[in-house]
A protein has these predicted regions:
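Short, polar/acidic, helix-capping and beta-turn segments at strand->helix junctions
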Residues: 1-124
Length: 125
């Protein structure tokens, strides 16, 4: 099954590349590697705001991380033209805005890791 068939089965429609909010480019390709700039979570087209442990909690954080992963996949598609050419996700880095006593950052980040690894099947993150 191709990546596009997997995305369709998950009801995922790839978004266009987000417009950079500052002086950076969405991605850089060098040789057979693509480096993607950071993305922010969006909910209904607007930044997904909140702080984990204060006004949002683990499950919502996982949904936000998954939303970022969908955006990242859309950017990767724009970079390579065909996601089936992607052999592997080498690194997925996550920055989680949380209170000092919040300890489930790893579970939040899993929202992105699970989509890329278990569902799409290209990650070894």
């Amino acid at each position: 099954m191709s990546i596009y068939e997997k995305l369709k089965a998950l009801d995922i429609v790839l978004p266009p590349v987000s417009t950079p909010a500052a002086a950076y480019v969405p991605f850089v390709q060098t040789g057979n590697l693509v480096f993607i700039s950071g993305h922010i979570a969006r909910k209904e087209g607007k930044p997904w705001v909140g702080q984990l442990g204060k006004n949002i909690f683990t499950e919502e954080g996982k949904r936000a991380a998954r939303a970022i992963a969908v955006d990242l996949i859309g950017t990767l598609h724009a970079a390579v033209g065909d996601l089936n050419r992607v052999k592997r996700i080498v690194k997925l880095m996550s920055l989680v805005n949380s209170t000092p006593d919040f300890t489930e950052q790893h579970l939040v980040t899993n929202g992105a890791s699970e989509l890329m690894g278990q569902k799409i099947g290209r990650a070894h993150v």
